[in-house]
Amino acid sequence: LGIGSTIGPQYLLPAPPVPLGTHPDGGPYTATAIAAGSYHTCALLNDGKIKCWGHNNYGQLGQGHSNTIGDQALEMGDSLPVIDTGGAGRAVSLGVGTYTTCAAFVDGRISCWGMGLGGGLGLGHTSNRGTDASHMGADLAFAEFGTDLSAVKVVAGGRGGVGVGTVTCALFTTHAVKCWGEGADGSLGRGDLTDIDTPEELGDNLDPIDLGDLGGSYPVDLSISFASGHVCAVLNDGRMKCWGSNSHGQLGIGDTQRRGGAADEMGESLPFVQTIANDFVVQVATTTTSTCALLASGVV
């Protein structure tokens, strides 16, 4: 919670604000976006920098060590450094998975740190990043998603508990969507259950997800569940498609069969989510076993 203790929020009502510290210009840091994983939280700050706190056993806080931050006094505020992303520039999108953190930067690159299992960091290996100072700063590694692509949004997820793995998806200026990492449950949308975790599978060899003939429409937003592995893409015309795990009907297509794990499940074969009266989807949020959509009418 970033409040300098492990006392549950029910004992601290009203909940105290998280101290983000002081900006170098003398004013307070403010958050423009926040994202939470299983046991860590990150804030995108008003200058494009990032601060994270919580569990850090895989380096997901990006501080070059594996110590928990935020459970003791004097660890937050000015005591918590911004993550050293070297010369990457401002972050424009923040994706926090089960045990990973990803950022898309103003130059279109993506970097992820934390758990590498499954290949969700996009580096062509499954080693953890962020647990050592040599992983950050000038040595920050960037995901290999292909040439002539510039990311505008990144989302991170994966599965928790037994069989834990990592998944990352990105939306590009071309409106293409690519996913990499653990392929279980079809969350990569590639028509198989294979992990994407080697150099040979990344870069230009990584194909965009086939969403079928969208009639000139295109994805404008993404959401991924951080603990079970399903992904949803919202189109500019308000329609939405989801794929991956579907054990509780979270894909919104009227059954509990996963999608994306077999060759005939994507493209034209992947149905659109049926909303109330086919209302326009404005925003989507995914949880472990459910999906929620804010519709243009204001209904959720």
Labelled PLM ranges:
Residues L1-V300:
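Eukaryote-biased RCC1-like beta-propeller repeat architecture
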